[in-house]
Amino acid sequence: MVQALSSYRSLSFWHDTVGDDLTPRSSLDGDLDVDVAIVGGGLTGLWTAWSLLQAAPGTRVVILEREIAGFGASGRNGGWCSALFPTSSTGLAAKHGRDAAVAMRRAMINTVDEVGRAAAAAGIDCDFVKRGTVVYARDEVQRRAAMADVAATEAFGAGLDGVDTLEWWGPDRVRAAGAVGATFDPACARLHPAK
């Protein structure tokens, strides 16, 4: 379903500020002969197409998107490229083994840097800046959970070999009203996802 251009701009801050033409491309008018068809023009679909073409430049790739690139969650997110993961390394290790937990954390960290490198190599000015993220703990329960995350990160060696690692910042360093401390994760960047 094709929507009016103004409605795409109202989807999110990112669409409103991108400055590009948000007119949907025309529908397919026939069959295509391609090697790979990717359904969805979000970050995952675009990244997959880019990666395929980097690995095999002659590959015939098409991205099929009903609306516009970044229409769904990719264009309505917080603008973060982060190695934060909803499960701890301890939880991953319990289910998949220690090596898999370490590999996952390292892959998450390396992906943040790879996104920055890829954007620069492709000449995409997406306002990529990697400066980390701070997550505040405001009570004892949050402090204990944060300390467990830091300990798990250290125990699983994700900070070895110069790879970024999670740090605990005490209240003297945080100096935020009501905070008992915070974690700092250097493996986080901000970017403009609609660019």
Locate the predicted segments by residue.
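Extreme N-terminal leader/targeting segments of oxidoreductases
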Residues: 1-36, 54-60
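Flavin (FAD/FMN) cofactor-binding and adjacent substrate-gating region
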Residues: 2-10, 16-18, 87-94, 117-195
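Glycine-rich Rossmann-fold phosphate-binding loop(s) that bind the pyrophosphate
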Residues: 40-46, 66
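Glycine-rich FAD pyrophosphate-binding loop
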Residues: 53-76
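Glycine-rich active-site loop/strand segments that organize a redox cofactor
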Residues: 76-107
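A non-catalytic, amphipathic alpha-helix used as a structural packing/dimerization or gating element
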Residues: 99-117, 148
